[in-house]
């Protein structure tokens, strides 16, 4: 079958089965075209509970599918590709978190959503890049242990100087490879372009940005801006998506190495096979995880809304 034929079959089957397809913005364009909703982690989290359907296929990382299941416990949830993980989500385990909590006993524990559901059971609240500042500001505690991404944590800390932060030495393996020199080279090659960056990048990179925001924030800024050229400082598929949606504008990656292969493992055939009952992985979580991580995630939705 051609790509178009596979897409048509997916659209037909998901309608027949009352299935909603959610896709993270880092997925390929051909996947976004069959999705009912595309966006960043926060958008996917909210949509998971809002969608009126009997089941959800998540095209993204495992923690996204688990979050979807926790927010929609009565729906069947599948991860389109069972090996789609997130390296950052695996950087800190429960034992490591407990050691950190012992070092910072009077700190509120704020977990980036890119963490395992098990880890979330012992955190006070989780956040996404688009909601982190707002949620941390609303917390009663003045001391915050931010895990696992120190880059996002430092960005939040700069916005909230009235609070004290402690960090874990984690981070996104892709975003942290971007350097100030990469930005300088990109600006030299495209002097008229605005630089839009994700806060998972290092401070030296974020400091040079014309705009700092989540994946969705970057896309919305670029679409609405009257400017015509942009250097994109996040996963390179966003360059592809923006160029597709805004053909009258020009988009350039800040660095060629900003490609997340973990998010690229999901294919149209994965979705097709999942709908056929021949692929994917249905998400099942123990009751203690559903309950414990649920408190953390529901508080995110409450404070972030």
Model-derived features: positions:
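Active-site loop-to-helix "anion-binding N-cap" substructures in soluble metabolic enzymes
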Residues: 1-232, 238-305
């Amino acid at each position: 079958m051609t790509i178009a034929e596979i897409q048509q079959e997916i659209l037909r089957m998901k309608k027949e089965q009352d299935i909603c397809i959610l896709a993270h913005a880092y997925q390929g364009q051909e996947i976004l075209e069959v999705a009912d909703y595309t966006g960043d982690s926060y958008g996917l989290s909210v949509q998971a509970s809002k969608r009126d359907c009997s089941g959800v296929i998540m095209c993204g990382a495992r923690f996204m599918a688990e979050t979807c299941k926790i927010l929609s416990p009565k729906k069947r949830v599948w991860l389109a590709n069972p090996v789609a993980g997130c390296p950052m989500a695996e950087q800190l385990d429960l034992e490591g978190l407990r050691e950190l909590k012992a070092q910072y006993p009077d700190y509120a524990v704020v977990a980036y959503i890119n963490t395992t559901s098990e880890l979330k059971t012992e955190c006070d609240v989780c956040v996404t890049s688009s909601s982190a500042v707002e949620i941390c500001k609303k917390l009663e505690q003045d001391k915050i242990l931010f895990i696992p991404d120190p880059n996002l944590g430092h960005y939040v800390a700069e916005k909230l100087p009235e609070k004290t932060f402690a960090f874990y030495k984690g981070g996104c393996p892709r975003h942290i490879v971007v350097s100030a020199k990469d930005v300088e080279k990109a600006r030299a090659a495209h002097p008229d372009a605005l630089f839009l960056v994700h806060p998972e990048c290092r401070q030296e990179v974020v400091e040079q940005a014309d705009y700092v925001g989540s994946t969705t924030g970057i896309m919305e800024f670029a679409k609405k801006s009257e400017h015509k050229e942009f250097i994109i400082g996040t996963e390179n598929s966003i360059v592809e998506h923006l160029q597709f949606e805004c053909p009258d504008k020009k988009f350039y990656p800040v660095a060629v190495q900003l490609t997340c292969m973990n998010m690229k493992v999901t294919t149209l055939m994965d979705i097709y096979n999942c709908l056929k009952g021949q692929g994917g992985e249905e998400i099942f979580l123990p009751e203690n995880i559903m309950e414990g991580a649920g408190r953390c995630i529901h508080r995110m939705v409450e404070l972030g809304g």
